[in-house]
């Protein structure tokens, strides 16, 4: 699984 944060 990949996690990311949109800035």
Curated annotation (Swiss-Prot):
Disulfide bonds: none annotated. The keyword Secreted applies. The keyword Transit peptide does not apply. Its main location: secreted. It is found in: Secreted. Keywords: Amidation, Neuropeptide, Secreted. One of its GO terms (cellular component) is extracellular region. This is Extended FMRFamide-1. The lineage of its organism: Eukaryota, Metazoa, Ecdysozoa, Arthropoda, Hexapoda.
């Amino acid at each position: 699984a990949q996690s990311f944060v949109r800035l």
